Structure formats: C-alpha cells, structure tokens
A protein has these predicted regions:
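Short, charged/polar N-terminal "headpieces" of proteins
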Residues: 1-11
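Short, functionally important structural connectors and interaction interfaces within domains
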Residues: 1-3, 30, 68
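A short linear-motif detector with a strong N-terminal bias
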Residues: 9-10, 33, 55
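Generic preference for hydrophobic/aromatic residues in regular secondary structure cores
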Residues: 9-10, 19, 66
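Generic secondary-structure microfeatures
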Residues: 13-15, 71
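A short, structured beta-strand/loop element
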Residues: 15-46
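Short, compact, well-ordered microdomains
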Residues: 51-78
Length: 78
C-alpha cells in the first residue's frame, strides 16, 4: 500500500489541471509527467526525496515539505 501524507497537496498541473497529490508516489508521477521545468533545483530535490520516501529511505512528510517548496517554485501550488 502506498504511503500517504497526513495532508494532501493540491496543485494546478499544466496538463491535467487541478490535481490532489496524496503521497510521494503520486508526487513522483506528477513530477515525471506534469512538471513544467525539469531542470529546476526544487524539482530535482523533490524528485530525489519522493523516490527515497517511496523506497522507505526518507520520511514521507519530509518529502512532502520538499514537494511543496518545488510546487511553489514552479508556481503550481493552489
């Protein structure tokens, strides 16, 4: 069963529109398929943290924090 965050992150994805992201696995999908800038430092850090959280090597809530920072940087956060 995928790890879920205590609180979801709602973003406005360029392709899918409004997206509710409930955990690091869903965040990885958004990062890999929907992200507007694949070179930004926030993107790279969020991708790395979410991968590590999915693998059980990092805390999922820490990955959420990094994902939120990246979403703000990319101007995707609601």
């Amino acid at each position: 069963m995928p790890v879920r965050w205590r609180e979801p992150v709602n973003i406005k994805a360029p392709v899918s529109g409004d997206v509710r992201v409930d955990g690091p696995f869903e965040a990885l999908i958004v990062l890999l398929e929907e992200w507007p800038d694949l070179r930004g430092s926030g993107y790279v850090r969020a991708r790395s943290m979410c991968r590590a959280a999915v693998a059980g090597h990092k805390d999922a809530e820490d990955a959420r924090k990094i994902f939120v920072v990246a979403a703000k940087e990319a101007k995707l956060l609601h």
